[in-house]
């Protein structure tokens, strides 16, 4: 999702002994502003819990806490063929999912890269046409003889969308760099279904889900110890099962066939945590990113911890050092002085540079930006990359700790997905150890931590399929799938 390549061996750390005093001073300054101590993590978690509760109240809060209308736990016995499409930050994924009915599934998939310009196209139809065309290409490839029976489709839509029932999604606001007009505050399901129908594809969108909810449900399908689904990728988010009686904003809106004790999957959308800037330790670089973003004042937590922004935080800090005369002296930085010219693959590659003199980093700056670097400058760049990556890992688990504390979970599995979790060097270990710091666990091995972050199942693909299966079952049994009258 954020262009992270295959893993390389863990890098060897060079000595800082030869770094000049003025650069060491800058490194120390960066360590002060980017290091997140345990007491800060605990304060962030405490505030997070209160914001989660506000989001479930009738009045609402910064964190949307969107009911996902998944009102059953998967049994693992769900079976059948389903299609899933996953619209995330960078790619459109189309998946054929075969649920085995024995806590197993098989998937066949294709990815279609979203053209960068499509994120901000002024023609709202263009996005849905692209998705429908990709879906048709996939169907033609997988079913050359055609389809005899309509196939149910689960649509993973990884943006804040409110739902009054499982097969609708009203976009609240664009995130992840998207800003397409005339879609916000509208139901996206009929927009997509219209383009599918126009192409005579025998498919019905039966469930719209968020990728994080999909991660939760797919992982629960194979592992009933799952307590949360989380995404560490282009965006950052968490989903979990709450209890209907604890969701104040749903009181009086549910059918009689939904008991107060019924579970309800909640898509938190907690990238918007602390939009009021009460507790998160923002730096001047975070403030610049926010002020120059399409939506200033929104998605504060995401802008500090998600993959979409890590490279830009690094670039801004290096530009600051350049303007102060500390690095890249007497060089042309015109190629480098462009917002988001560094995606998250850059700090990742710098962190895993295996050479003591950081030759890969030297090549990276020369080849991509025409910048010559000294060994000492590269050591600053490397340390800064480590600090930014570690801060993201540590802050990102505050949402996990908050939900586990709110729900009273002492043990369990947190199913994690996303390119940053899967491929950013050291992220898994740093995230796990931040949880350890918040809780004060004494165990020394990650495998022994009471709450473990584990790799998710195929979240958005299989998750969309399992949710479509659960929705179909409810409909077949005549049960409610949304708010009364929706």
UniProtKB/Swiss-Prot annotation:
Does the record bear ATP-binding in its keywords? yes
Q: Where does ATP bind?
A: 86-91, 111, 307-308, 344-348, 419-423
Q: Does the keyword section mention Kinase?
A: yes
SUPFAM superfamilies assigned:
Actin-like ATPase domain
Phosphoserine occurs at 15, 158, 245, 272
Q: Which residues carry this modification: Phosphothreonine?
A: 38
Molecular function (GO) terms listed? ATP binding; D-glucose binding; fructokinase activity; glucokinase activity; hexokinase activity; mannokinase activity
The organism's place on the tree of life at top rank: Eukaryota
Q: Name one GO biological process term.
A: fructose import across plasma membrane
Q: Which residues bind substrate?
A: 158, 175-176, 210-211, 237, 269, 302
Q: What is its EC number?
A: 2.7.1.1
Ranges where the record places region Hexokinase small subdomain: 75-209
Q: Which residues form the Hexokinase domain?
A: 21-469
- Reactions it catalyzes: a D-hexose + ATP = a D-hexose 6-phosphate + ADP + H(+); D-fructose + ATP = D-fructose 6-phosphate + ADP + H(+); D-glucose + ATP = D-glucose 6-phosphate + ADP + H(+)
Name one cellular component (GO) term: mitochondrion
Subunit text: Homodimer.
Concerning its family, UniProt says:
Belongs to the hexokinase family.
Please explain the role this protein plays, according to its UniProt record: Catalyzes the phosphorylation of hexose, such as D-glucose and D-fructose, to hexose 6-phosphate (D-glucose 6-phosphate and D-fructose 6-phosphate, respectively). Mediates the initial step of glycolysis by catalyzing phosphorylation of D-glucose to D-glucose 6-phosphate.
**Miscellaneous field:** In yeast there are three glucose-phosphorylating isoenzymes, designated hexokinase I, II and glucokinase. Present with 114000 molecules/cell in log phase SD medium.
* Matches recorded under PANTHER family: HEXOKINASE (PTHR19443), HEXOKINASE TYPE 1-RELATED (PTHR19443:SF16)
What this protein is called in its record is Hexokinase-2
Which organism does this sequence originate in? Saccharomyces cerevisiae (strain ATCC 204508 / S288c) (Baker's yeast)
Q: Which gene encodes it?
A: HXK2
